[in-house]
């Protein structure tokens, strides 16, 4: 999400009262930030985010996009499923944060190269703040274009998700453990 060494300083340089996470593979719609600010004000949440609307252009990318939006593909997180209702969430895709809440919990942890949002949302929730999902917020996401890039992405995501669990043991959930448990079970036979 953030280039190495930058994530920890983003919140200090933000000029306004919100900090928006942006991903190189995501395309925010023209009203994304305005809608997010309205949701922050209406809900009182510390972070709001929405649908990761995966769309591919090649057959491979379309297949990956279909897997991303399947309950079986990435575990059925609300931000992957278009029919998910608005409400509190463990995490959201490309959140828009209240700067004051971000600073109150120490901001993005620069020791995480990836999974900063998962880790930060954990700290926000455990400080009594709310993370809010709304399907009104939609980001077009462009999946990796080949098997090698996708495998590399998932490998690194898994490494950093494991680090979040090591740092915050009670953040482990079946959704994140299902894939590695399945792989180990298949390998053991």
Model-derived regions: residue spans:
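Conserved donor NDP-sugar-binding/catalytic core segment of glycosyltransferases
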Residues: 27-62, 66, 138, 142
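A conserved catalytic-core signature of glycosyltransferases
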Residues: 84, 88-98, 109, 115, ...
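Alpha-helical bilayer-embedded segments of polytopic membrane proteins, i.e.
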Residues: 168-189
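Short, well-ordered alpha-helical scaffold segment located
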Residues: 100-104, 138
């Amino acid at each position: 999400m953030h280039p190495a060494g930058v994530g920890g300083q983003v919140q200090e340089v933000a000029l306004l009262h919100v900090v928006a996470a942006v991903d190189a593979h995501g395309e925010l719609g023209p009203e994304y930030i305005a809608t997010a600010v309205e949701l922050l004000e209406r809900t009182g949440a510390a972070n709001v985010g929405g649908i990761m609307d995966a769309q591919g252009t090649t057959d491979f990318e379309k297949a990956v996009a279909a897997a991303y939006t399947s309950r079986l593909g990435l575990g059925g997180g609300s931000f992957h499923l278009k029919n998910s209702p608005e409400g509190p969430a463990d995490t959201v895709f490309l959140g828009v944060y209240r700067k004051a809440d971000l600073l109150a919990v120490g901001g993005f942890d620069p020791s995480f190269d990836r999974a900063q949002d998962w880790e930060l949302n954990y700290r926000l929730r455990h400080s009594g703040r709310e993370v809010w999902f709304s399907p009104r917020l939609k980001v077009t996401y462009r999946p990796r274009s080949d098997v090698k890039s996708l495998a590399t992405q998932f490998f690194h995501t898994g490494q950093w998700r494991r680090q979040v669990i090591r740092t915050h043991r009670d953040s482990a959930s079946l959704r994140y453990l299902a894939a590695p448990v399945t792989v180990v079970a298949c390998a053991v036979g």
